[in-house]
Amino acid sequence: MSEAEARPTNFIRQIIDEDLASGKHTTVHTRFPPEPNGYLHIGHAKSICLNFGIAQDYKGQCNLRFDDTNPVKEDIEYVESIKNDVEWLGFHWSGNVRYSSDYFDQLHAYAIELINKGLAYVDELTPEQIREYRGTLTQPGKNSPYRDRSVEENLALFEKMRTGGFEEGKACLRAKIDMASPFIVMRDPVLYRIKFAEHHQTGNKWCIYPMYDFTHCISDALEGITHSLCTLEFQDNRRLYDWVLDNITIPVHPRQYEFSRLNLEYTVMSKRKLNLLVTDKHVEGWDDPRMPTISGLRRRGYTAASIREFCKRIGVTKQDNTIEMASLESCIREDLNENAPRAMAVIDPVKLVIENYQGEGEMVTMPNHPNKPEMGSRQVPFSGEIWIDRADFREEANKQYKRLVLGKEVRLRNAYVIKAERVEKDAEGNITTIFCTYDADTLSKDPADGRKVKGVIHWVSAAHALPIEIRLYDRLFSVPNPGAADDFLSVINPESLVIKQGFAEPSLKDAVAGKAFQFEREGYFCLDSRHSTAEKPVFNRTVGLRDTWAKVGE
C-alpha cells in the first residue's frame, strides 16, 4: 500500500488535494488554537489529530497557538498542560509556541484601520443594551445611537479605551456591518472590550483585549495558515472571518472549513459542566480517571496510540453524531491486548490452602504475553497457601460454571490441578478458607490418566502477595446522553468508582505509572500516578476484557 493510499480520506483532505493540484497552495499549513482556560478533552484530541495529522501527512506545518485574549479566565498552568497533552499524543508543533497576544500590536493597528475606513465604532451601550439591540433570529436588530460617530471621534475614544479612560463595560469597539443581517454574528459584533486584568504573557501592557472572531482570522493570516479548521459551531462565524480579512490590508486570506465536533456517550464535553464536576468535588480533579480529559484518560491508562486510532476510526465529517463509548474502549482494549504484559492479581480474595502440598514453595514460569514469546517470561512464586478470587469458587454449580466447585477440579494458571475438598466459614456463613488437594504431577501439563480439567483460574501466593488497592473505574454517567438531563449531576453513575483491597504477584512492585498490564481474567490496569506509594501500590482499571455495557444498551 502506498503512502497516499494509507492516508485517511475525508472532505477536508479532498479540498487540500484539489488546492495542491491546482497550484492554489504549494504547501499545507494548519494550526491548533486552544484557549488556555482549561484542560483538553477527547474532543480536542480529534482536532489535534486532524490538524497535526494533516501537516504530517502532507509534509507541511502545524502551529500550536494559544488563543489568549481573555486574561480573566486564562492561566499559565493550562498552557503547560496543553503543551504536554499535544506532545504526549505524539505530535510536535512547527517552530515556537505561538500566542494570539504576540499579535496584539498588529491587531490594534488593524482595528484602527477599520475605524479609519468607517467600518468600526466605539459604542457606549451597556452589555445588556447591546444584547437587546441585537434582536433575535426572527427579529432584526436596531442601530446603536453611537453608530454614526465620526472617524475622528471613534479614533479618540478608542485611544481613551486603550489608555484606561473607561471603566469595564462602559465602552467597546464594534464592527459596522449590518444590524438587519439574518446572521446574528454579523450584527455589528464586538471587536474589542475593556478588561483590567494582568495577562500571563503581556502583563499590564493592555487593558483592551480583542475578541476571538477578530483575533482568530488575523492570526491565521499573519501565520500564513492555508486551511483553518474549526468545528461546526463556528460555521456562521466564517462570514465574520471573511469580512474582517476582506476589509483590512493583509496579503493572505486563509479559508475556514468546519467539521463536526466529537460527541461521546456517557460523558459531557462542556467546559462549564466539567468545571462543575471538579469544583463541586464529584470527581477529584481534572485528571480524575473518569473524566474525558486527556490527562484523565492518560491517568486511567489510555495510550496515545489508542486515542489516535479512535480519532482515525471516527473520521471527519460535517454530520453531527454521537459516538458510542464502546468505540473508544475497543481501541484501548485492542492496543493493550496486543502490547500489555500479563500479570496476576486477585481483586476479591479468599484464602485457599493446599493440604497435601509439601515444602516452602517453588517458582513457576509464566509467559509475559501468551502470543508474543519475544516479550519473555517471569518467575512467579507458588506455595501451599494462595489467594483466589471469591467469584472463582462455588460450593455447588451447574455445568456452565468452569471454575472451582466443591468436590471438583480446576487448573491453577501455569501451575497445578487442584480439587476442592471442604470449606471453612465464619459465623455469618461467609467462606473464609477453601481446603484443597493438588495433583503433584500436573505442573503445566495434563493429568497422566487422561482426565479432562476444563477450568483455569488465576491465583497469588499468600506468602509472597503484594497488597494493592484496586480502583474499578467505570463510566461517569449512567445514561448515554447526560447532557440532555434536566440536571446532569443527577445521572452520575454511583458505581463509577469502586475501591477494592486485593493482592498481586510480587513482580508488580516494580510497576511504573504509564505502563499497563493485563490482570489475567480481570481486565487492563495501570499504576495510579497520584495515589500509589511504595508500601501500597494503587492500580486503576483502564477497561475490562470485554464490553460489559453492551447488554445494558440492548
UniProtKB/Swiss-Prot annotation:
PANTHER family: GLUTAMATE--TRNA LIGASE, GLUTAMINE-TRNA LIGASE. The keyword Nucleotide-binding applies. It catalyses: tRNA(Gln) + L-glutamine + ATP = L-glutaminyl-tRNA(Gln) + AMP + diphosphate. This is Glutamine--tRNA ligase. L-glutamine binds at D67, Y212. Residues 317-324 are annotated as: Interaction with tRNA. It comes from the Bacteria. It is found in: Cytoplasm. Monomer. The gene is glnS. It comes from Escherichia coli O7:K1 (strain IAI39 / ExPEC). GO terms for biological process: glutaminyl-tRNA aminoacylation; glutamyl-tRNA aminoacylation. Belongs to the class-I aminoacyl-tRNA synthetase family. PROSITE patterns: AA_TRNA_LIGASE_I. It is an enzyme of class 6 (ligase). Its EC number is 6.1.1.18. Keywords: Aminoacyl-tRNA synthetase, ATP-binding, Cytoplasm, Ligase, Nucleotide-binding, Protein biosynthesis.
